[in-house]
C-alpha cells in the first residue's frame, strides 16, 4: 500500500488510501475541465499575496510565471494529471512545485480547496452562460428568418391537439422566440448570483492571514464577494438555479421538437425533412426519420434529472463544505453540454433541415371548422349576445357535421334559416385569411400585429 506522505494532506495519516477508494474519491477525471479557471483563480490569488506583502513581489511573479507555464504545457498537450493527484487543484499545485521549487508551496496561503473550487466553478459557469446566451440568440434568429418569410402562410392552431383556430405561421414561430427570450432573461438573472466571489473564505471561517478578498474579486471580474464565509463555501444555489433555467430551455426545445415530429408525420405532413437533418431506416427504405428533434426531446430528461439530483444532494447537508459537493460538477458539465448541443442542433434543423409544405398547410386550414368562432363573432357584431351566438353556431356545426359539409359550403338560403342576420358577406368572414387577419388584439395573430412583432424582433436580434 502506498505511503500516506504521497498526498498533500497526508502528514496527518500513517497509511495510504486503498487503491479503489483513492479512485472513488478522486475527481481529476472530470474536474480537469476547470483547469483554465483554476489557473486564473490561482494567478489572481498569487498577485494578491504579493500586493498584500504576504509573499514578496518576486515570489508572486515566480508563482504567476509557473502557473502560466502550466497553462502552456496543457495547451501543448504536455500536462497529464493522474488519479493520485486527486483533483485539479492538487494537480496544479504539484506541477507548480515541480516547476519552480519550494516557493510553489506558498500559493495556497490564505485559501482552501473549499473556496477555490467554488471560485473555479463560478468562473467556468459564467463563461458557459454567456455561450448559451449566444446559442439562444442563434435559435431566435433561425426561427425569426423563417417567420419573416411566412407572415401570410397559415397553419392550424390547436388546443388539446384539436383544431382550434388558424394562425399565421410567423405567429407560431414567434411564440418560441418569446420563450427563448425568457430563457435568456433567466440566465442573465442567474449570472448575477454566479458572479459573486467566494475566494478568501478559506475552509469555512475565513483566515487570520491579511488577504484582500476585494483584490482577487476585482482581478477575476466578479461583481462582489460573499459577506459570510460559511455561506460562501457551502452555497450551491447558483448551480440549482442554472440547472432550473437549463431545464426550462430543454422543456421549450422539447415542445418545439414534439411539434416538428408531428408536423413531419404523414398524418400532419406540414413539413418535409431535408436530407441534411434526417436519417433512414435499416429495414424500411421509405423512411425518413426526425432523429434530431427526437434526440432533443429525449435529452431533456437528462437535464431534468440533474436538477432533481442537485436538489436531493443539498437538502440534507449541514454547514459548511461536504464531499457531496463533488457531485455538482458532472451534473453541471453534462447539462451545459446537453443544452448547448441541443440548441445548436435545433437551430441547424430550422436553418436547413425542414421545408414547410404550403399547399398542405393551406388545405389544412381550409378543410375544418376552425372558423366557427368567427361565425359567432359575426353575429356579435350584429348585437347578438355572445353566448346566444355561440350556442347557435354550435348547432350549425353539429348539423354540418351530420350532413358532411363545411361552413363555407352552406348555401346562403340555408344560413338564413339559422338566423336572419346572415348575409352574403358571411363567406368572406369564413376565409382562413380573413379569420387570421381579424385577430387584431394586442399580441394576436392578425397580420398587422404579427408584422409589428417581426419589426420589433428584427430590431432586437439584428441591430
UniProtKB/Swiss-Prot annotation:
EC number: 4.3.2.1
Transmembrane segments annotated in the record for this chain: none
Any Pfam family matching the protein: ASL_C2
GO MF: argininosuccinate lyase activity
Signal sequence residues: none
Catalyzed reaction equations: 2-(N(omega)-L-arginino)succinate = fumarate + L-arginine
Root EC class: lyase
SUPFAM superfamilies reported in the protein's UniProt record: L-aspartase-like
GO biological process per UniProt: arginine biosynthetic process via ornithine; L-arginine biosynthetic process
Pathway stated in the Swiss-Prot or TrEMBL entry: Amino-acid biosynthesis; L-arginine biosynthesis; L-arginine from L-ornithine and carbamoyl phosphate: step 3/3
Principal subcellular localisation of the protein: cytoplasm
InterPro entries: Arg_succ_lyase_C (IPR029419), Argininosuccinate_lyase (IPR009049), Fumarase/histidase_N (IPR024083), Fumarate_lyase_CS (IPR020557), Fumarate_lyase_fam (IPR000362), Fumarate_lyase_N (IPR022761), L-Aspartase-like (IPR008948)
Cellular location(s): Cytoplasm
Keywords recorded for this protein, A-Z: Amino-acid biosynthesis, Arginine biosynthesis, Cytoplasm, Lyase
GO cellular component terms, semicolon-separated: cytosol
Protein family according to the UniProt entry: Belongs to the lyase 1 family. Argininosuccinate lyase subfamily.
HAMAP family membership: Arg_succ_lyase
Protein name: Argininosuccinate lyase
Taxonomic classification: Bacteria, Bacillati, Cyanobacteriota, Cyanophyceae, Synechococcales
Gene, per the UniProt record: argH
